[in-house]
């Protein structure tokens, strides 16, 4: 949500659509159906019950439906590109260190080294995902956040080994 607002302030786009799509994009987690599909259905029904403009509801539903298709080269609206980039940015940076550290802490054999390897693996998996960013502003921020992780890993290596 916060990344969507930050990107919108740089790039423009309909703030109402961006905010509502960002807040509701993951509402449809489901084990049997793609969560974009489920989420779009839930969001459309909910927003309709609130009396939101039907044209905005349609755009929000479309964004939620396809937000997880990060590898698509489809002709996406600015609002959709912003929500997709915000979704990627929400997963990387300092917050990922916290998530990995907390996940490691609840393991049976928690240690600093296990947290280090988990964070390093996260970095390795997520660094190439910069190519999934749909806006230049998203790519720039993603790059900064990955640099933060790289610097953190470098410092942690100096302290652990």
Q: Predicted segments — roles?
A:
Residues 1-18, 30, 42-51:
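Alpha-helical phosphate/pyrophosphate-handling elements in metalloenzyme active cores
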Residues 2-12, 24, 52, 72-161:
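Divalent metal-dependent phosphate-bond-processing catalytic cores, especially two-metal-ion Mg2+/Mn2+ enzymes
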Residues 15-35, 39, 60-69:
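His-Asp-centered metal-binding catalytic motifs of divalent-metal-dependent phosphohydrolases/nucleases
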Residues 34, 45, 97-99:
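Residues at secondary-structure transition points
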Residues 37-80:
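Helix-adjacent hinge/juxtasegments
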